[in-house]
């Protein structure tokens, strides 16, 4: 157990990761040494940043807390603190059930931890934080909360209403990260296309991304978590025209059946969805779309699911994730719908949908063989350097494997790579001399 060392454990999404990075920087400004390795904790203090989005995430967060409680009981830890979404939503219950935790903090008051440790809240300068990602890329959270209130989603119950950061504040953060050596920026929020509406009633995502792309040193910008309803079409022109805005868009469609879209309270129709996809592909040739779909939502019929399968087969998304419905306490669907799709049916539908997508993904990736792409190197792993094209977001998308026997490459540097082969998950390539 190392004195003045704090182990930070982050559960859940990249938005949580940004919060962890910010508080790590605050701790370091106050003389602490911070680590971000849950597998090898050694500090006298641990801070667990929890996720409370779905049941599986809650269970993972609780199990992690219990692991650290055992460390504390065994004398391997002096203080244990919990923050994040789970404690934001269930603080009272957690305090009653887990008295071994020294204190619980919510999603927005975690900086109080500094005061409780007798330390000062040091204002972050231009978003400077302790990056836990490879030094060449960072996540930039441009807003918190969500105003959409989809029937299945607990996010508004946890994070509250949509709250955009001012444009200049975000741009200052990006400039600060560029000064730290960051080249690639993953732009994240719960509903990216709503950005700015809460400030003055207008969409500002297009302005933000356009101005961000003009900052010297910004090599790649990638957009995550758009929403199809009221999608600002002028954003597509920025993606098409700015060479450092990746031709990549993460936009969750969730379903295609009008019956399901209505019950999910998505405020978009099947035809509007199909029209939007066609317009995206028309305006941005070569764009890679990542989407998320939900199966087994209450009331989903065999006909609804058949419609969803046809949609996946015809839309041919480059990237797709899918989940089966789990009832979340307090949501509209939990209050008004019976969870009437059996679990085995949910799983069968999920497996069938992903099998369709797997075939599409393999076919689309195979078409890249023989073509040359700009690739950033993330790391060296065994006999390969591992990199990504502009069409691949970290952690979730296919990677490019380049033999380390070929030549010495530098992590964080861009190379032109000719794709020589592909398999179920990844691409293989050689650096173009």
Predicted regions and their residues:
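Proteins enriched for Cys/Gly/acidic motifs involved in redox and nucleic-acid/cofactor modification
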Residues: 1-195, 234, 249, 271-279, ...
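Conserved SAM/AdoMet-binding glycine-rich loop
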Residues: 78-84, 89, 94, 179-305, ...
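Short acidic/polar active-site loop segments enriched in Thr and Asp
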Residues: 102, 183, 219, 318, ...
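Short strand-connecting beta-turns/loops that link adjacent beta-strands
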Residues: 147, 244, 256, 380-382, ...
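Active-site proximal loops enriched in glycine and acidic residues that flank catalytic Cys/His/Asp
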Residues: 189, 225, 253-255, 291-295, ...
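Terminal RNA-binding accessory module
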Residues: 333-433
């Amino acid at each position: 157990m190392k004195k003045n060392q704090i182990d930070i454990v982050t559960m859940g999404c990249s938005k949580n990761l940004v919060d962890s990075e910010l508080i790590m920087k605050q701790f370091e400004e106050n003389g602490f040494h911070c680590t971000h390795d849950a597998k090898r904790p050694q500090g006298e203090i641990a801070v667990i940043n929890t996720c409370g989005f779905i049941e599986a995430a809650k269970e993972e967060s609780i199990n992690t807390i219990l692991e650290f409680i055992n460390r504390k009981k065994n004398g391997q830890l002096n203080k244990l603190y919990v923050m994040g979404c789970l404690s934001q939503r269930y603080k009272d219950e957690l305090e009653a059930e887990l008295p071994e935790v020294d204190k619980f903090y919510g999603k927005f008051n975690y900086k109080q931890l500094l005061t409780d440790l007798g330390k000062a809240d040091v204002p972050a300068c231009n978003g400077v934080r302790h990056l836990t990602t490879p030094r060449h890329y960072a996540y930039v959270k441009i807003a918190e909360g969500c105003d959409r209130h989809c029937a299945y989603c607990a996010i508004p119950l946890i994070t509250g209403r949509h709250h955009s950061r001012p444009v200049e504040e975000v741009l200052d953060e990006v400039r600060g990260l560029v000064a730290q050596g960051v080249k690639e920026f993953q732009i994240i929020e719960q509903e990216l296309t709503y950005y700015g509406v809460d400030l003055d009633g207008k969409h500002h995502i297009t302005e933000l991304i356009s101005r961000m792309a003009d900052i010297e040193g910004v090599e790649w910008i990638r957009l995550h978590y758009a929403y199809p309803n009221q999608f600002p079409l002028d954003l597509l022109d920025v993606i098409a025209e700015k060479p450092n805005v990746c031709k990549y868009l993460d936009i969750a469609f969730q379903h295609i059946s009008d019956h399901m879209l209505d019950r999910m309270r998505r405020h978009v129709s099947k035809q509007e969805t199909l029209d939007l996809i066609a317009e995206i592909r028309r305006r941005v040739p070569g764009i890679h779309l990542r989407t998320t779909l939900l199966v087994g939502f209450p009331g989903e019929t065999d006909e609804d699911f058949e419609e969803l399968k046809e949609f996946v087969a015809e839309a041919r998304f480059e990237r797709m994730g899918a989940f089966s419905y789990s009832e979340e306490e307090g949501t509209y669907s939990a209050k008004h719908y019976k969870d009437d799709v059996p679990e085995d049916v949910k799983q069968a539908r999920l497996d069938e949908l992903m099998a369709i997508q797997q075939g599409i993904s393999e076919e689309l990736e195979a078409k890249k063989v023989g073509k040359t792409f700009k690739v950033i190197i993330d790391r060296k792993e065994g006999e390969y350097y591992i990199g990504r094209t502009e069409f691949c977001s970290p952690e979730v998308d296919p990677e490019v494997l380049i033999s380390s026997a070929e030549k010495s490459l530098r992590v964080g540097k861009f190379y032109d790579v000719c794709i020589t082969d592909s398999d179920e998950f990844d691409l293989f390539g050689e650096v173009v001399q």
